[in-house]
C-alpha cells in the first residue's frame, strides 16, 4: 500500500475512534463509528485476493447493518424524548436496539458470526487491528450507556459469548480463528461486569489488548498462521516459542500471569454483589478456552518434529521484522499480577 495512503487511513482511523470516545452527542459518535468502519475496509484489503475481498465485504455488510440499527434507535429516541445526549436515552425500545447494534459492532454473541470469518480472511496485522483497536469505540459508548441499559440482555449476551467463544475454538486449526473466538469470549467477560463496575471493563479491555497484541506480533514475526506451522516454531525460534506459550497461558487467565488479574477482580466484584451462580458459570465455561490454549502450547513446544541441521539453521535466513515493542509487551503480559492490590484500590 502507498505509504501516504496508509498514513491517511491510519490517521482517519485514529480520529474516528477519538471522536466517538470523546463524544456525548449521538450524532457525532455515529459519525466517528462510520469513519472507523470506512477506513477499516482498505486495511482489511491490504493484500488483494479473493479471501480478503470476501472478508472486507462481510465486514462492511455487518457494520453497515449495525449502523442502520443504531441510527434507527437514535431516531426513535429523538421522537420520544427530543434528546441527542448519550446519557439520556430514556426510551426502552431505542435503548435495546442501540445495545444490539453496538453488540454487533463488538462481535459479541449472538451477533458474532462475522468475527471468525473476517479475521481468517485477512492478514495478521489487519486481524490484530480488527480484534483490538476496533473494540474501543463501541465499548466506550456502552460504558456511557451502562446506567440505563437492559441488564438482562447484557448478561445473556455475555454468557453466550463466553460459551460460544470457548466452544467454537475447540475444533479450529487456524490460529486467526482461534484468536477470534478468544476475542468473543473475552468480550463476554467485559459485558457481564459492565453494569456492576464499568472500570473493571476498561481494565479487562486494556489487558486483553495487551495480550492479543503480543500474540499477533509473535505470530507475525514467525510467519505462523496454522497449527501445522506452529509445530515448526521450536526448531526455528525457541525464544519466541517460550514467549508465545506464557502469553497464551496469560490470555487463558492462569495465575500468576497478568491475564488472571481482571478475572480475579471481576469474580470478586460479582460475589461482593451476592451473585454466586454467574461467576461460577463463567469460570467453568472459561475452561473451554483454557483447553484450546493448552492445545496450542502442546503443538508449539511439546510436539517437536524430527529435524536436520539445515532445518535448525532456517531461522537465520528467515526475514523477520524485529520490533522493540515486543519485549515490553511480553513483560507486561506476564508480570502485572503483583499490581492487583494497587489496581483494586483505584476502583
From Swiss-Prot:
Gene Ontology annotations for the cellular component aspect, listed alphabetically: mitochondrial inner membrane
Residue ranges crossing the lipid bilayer per the database entry: 3-23, 25-45, 59-79, 93-115, 150-170, 178-198, 200-220, 240-260, 274-294, 326-346
Keyword tags: Electron transport, Extinct organism protein, Membrane, Mitochondrion, Mitochondrion inner membrane, NAD, Respiratory chain, Translocase, Transmembrane, Transmembrane helix, Transport, Ubiquinone
Annotated disulfide bonds: none
UniProt record similarity statement: Belongs to the complex I subunit 2 family.
Subunit structure: Core subunit of respiratory chain NADH dehydrogenase (Complex I) which is composed of 45 different subunits. Interacts with TMEM242.
Stated name of the protein: NADH-ubiquinone oxidoreductase chain 2
Native source organism of the sequence: Mammuthus primigenius
Amino acid at each position: 500500500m502507498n505509504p501516504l495512503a496508509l498514513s491517511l487511513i491510519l490517521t482517519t482511523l485514529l480520529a474516528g475512534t477519538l471522536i466517538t470516545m470523546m463524544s456525548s452527542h449521538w450524532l457525532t459518535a455515529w459519525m466517528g463509528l462510520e469513519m472507523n468502519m470506512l477506513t477499516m475496509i482498505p486495511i482489511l484489503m491490504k493484500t488483494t485476493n479473493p479471501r480478503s475481498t470476501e472478508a472486507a465485504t462481510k465486514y462492511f455488510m455487518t457494520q453497515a447493518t449495525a449502523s442502520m440499527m443504531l441510527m434507527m434507535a437514535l431516531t426513535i429516541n429523538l421522537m420520544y424524548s427530543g434528546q441527542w445526549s448519550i446519557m439520556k436515552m430514556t426510551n426502552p425500545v431505542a435503548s435495546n436496539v442501540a445495545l444490539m447494534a453496538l453488540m454487533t459492532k463488538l462481535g459479541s454473541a449472538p451477533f458474532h458470526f462475522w468475527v471468525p470469518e473476517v479475521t481468517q480472511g485477512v492478514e495478521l496485522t489487519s486481524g490484530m487491528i480488527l480484534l483490538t483497536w476496533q473494540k474501543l469505540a463501541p465499548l466506550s459508548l456502552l460504558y456511557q450507556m451502562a446506567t440505563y441499559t437492559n441488564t438482562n440482555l447484557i448478561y445473556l449476551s455475555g454468557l453466550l459469548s463466553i460459551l460460544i467463544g470457548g466452544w467454537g475454538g475447540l475444533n479450529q486449526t487456524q490460529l486467526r480463528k482461534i484468536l477470534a473466538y478468544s476475542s468473543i469470549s473475552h468480550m463476554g467477560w467485559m459485558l457481564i461486569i459492565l453494569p456492576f463496575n464499568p472500570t473493571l471493563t476498561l481494565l479487562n479491555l486494556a489487558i486483553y489488548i495487551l495480550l492479543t497484541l503480543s500474540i499477533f506480533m509473535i505470530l507475525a514475526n514467525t510467519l505462523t498462521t496454522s497449527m501445522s506451522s506452529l509445530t515448526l516454531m521450536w526448531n526455528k525460534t525457541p525464544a519466541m516459542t517460550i514467549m508465545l506459550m506464557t502469553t497464551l497461558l496469560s490470555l487463558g487467565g492462569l495465575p500468576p500471569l497478568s491475564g488472571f488479574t481482571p478475572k480475579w477482580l471481576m469474580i470478586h466484584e460479582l460475589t461482593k454483589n451476592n451473585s454466586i451462580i454467574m461467576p461460577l458459570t463463567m469460570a467453568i465455561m472459561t475452561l473451554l478456552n483454557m483447553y484450546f490454549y493448552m492445545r496450542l502450547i502442546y503443538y508449539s513446544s511439546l510436539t517437536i518434529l524430527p529435524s536436520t541441521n539445515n532445518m535448525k539453521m532456517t531461522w537465520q535466513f528467515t526475514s523477520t521484522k524485529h520490533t522493540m515493542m515486543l519485549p515490553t509487551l511480553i513483560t507486561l503480559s506476564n508480570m502485572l499480577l503483583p499490581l492487583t492490590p494497587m489496581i483494586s484500590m483505584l476502583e
